[in-house]
A protein has these predicted regions:
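A short beta-strand micro-motif common to beta-rich folds, especially ectodomain repeats
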Residues: 136-142, 147-160
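C-terminal edge beta-strand
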Residues: 161-173
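Bacterial signal peptide processing site
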Residues: 21-23
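C-terminal motif of bacterial Sec signal peptides marking the signal peptidase cleavage site
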Residues: 16-19
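Hydrophobic residues positioned within well-ordered beta-strands of beta-sheet architectures
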Residues: 54-56, 138, 152, 165-167
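Surface-exposed binding patches on compact interaction domains or structured appendages
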Residues: 27-41, 51-137
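Sec-dependent N-terminal signal peptides
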Residues: 4-13
Length: 173
C-alpha cells in the first residue's frame, strides 16, 4: 500500500509541476537587431541593382509601432519601404538579366499585417509603420550624399505597454 501511495504521490507531483511550466516566451517584449547604426558613404548593404538598403529586424510579443525621426522635419534622407526587390529567376534558379546585363527584379511586400503610414514626399517613402507579434524585416532605403553627415533615430515601441527600443542612425562622410 505504501508503494502505491508513493507512486501516486510522485505521479501527481509530476502532473502539477508540468502544468505550471509556461510555454517558451521571449525574454523581452521587443527586440531590435542593431544599435547605433552607422551608414558609411559606401553603402553597407546594396540592393539587387545597387540601391542603398539596410534591413531592421523587429521581434515583438505584441503590437508595435516604428518611427523614423529626423532633426529637421524636411530632411527625409532615409525612409522605410513597404516592399523590397528580389531577383527574378528562371525554372533552374538562375537570375534573369536583360539585354544590358541588369538583373530583372520584382517587388515583394514586406509582410502581411504590417501597416504603413505616408510621411514622405513620394509614394513608397514612409516614416511610420505598425505591426503585430512576430518577426518582421523592415527595409530602410537611403540617399547617398558625399561630404555630408546626417542623423536620424529609428524608434520602435510596444503600443500596449511602456516599452521601446531605438537605434541612432548616422550617415558618415
Amino acid at each position: 500500500m505504501k508503494k502505491i501511495l508513493a507512486i501516486l504521490t510522485v505521479f501527481f507531483a509530476a502532473v502539477v509541476a508540468t502544468s505550471c511550466v509556461k510555454p517558451y516566451e521571449l525574454t523581452e517584449p521587443l527586440t531590435l537587431d542593431n544599435y547605433d547604426l552607422t551608414i558609411p558613404k559606401t553603402a553597407n548593404k546594396k540592393g539587387i541593382n545597387g540601391e542603398n538598403i539596410h534591413y531592421f529586424c523587429i521581434t515583438a510579443t505584441g503590437d508595435w509601432e516604428a518611427t523614423l525621426e529626423f532633426p529637421s522635419t524636411d530632411d527625409l534622407w532615409c525612409w522605410l519601404n513597404d516592399s523590397y526587390s528580389v531577383a527574378k529567376k528562371d525554372e533552374y534558379g538562375n537570375q534573369i538579366k536583360d539585354e544590358y546585363g541588369r538583373i530583372q527584379t520584382e517587388q515583394v511586400k514586406v509582410a502581411s499585417g504590417v501597416e504603413y503610414f505616408p510621411g514622405g514626399e513620394e509614394d513608397g517613402k514612409f516614416r511610420v509603420v505598425r505591426g503585430s507579434a512576430g518577426t518582421t524585416y523592415l527595409p530602410m532605403q537611403y540617399n547617398d550624399n558625399a561630404g555630408v553627415v546626417r542623423y536620424a533615430t529609428f524608434r520602435v515601441r510596444r503600443t500596449d505597454m511602456d516599452y521601446e527600443k531605438f537605434t541612432n542612425i548616422t550617415q558618415s562622410k
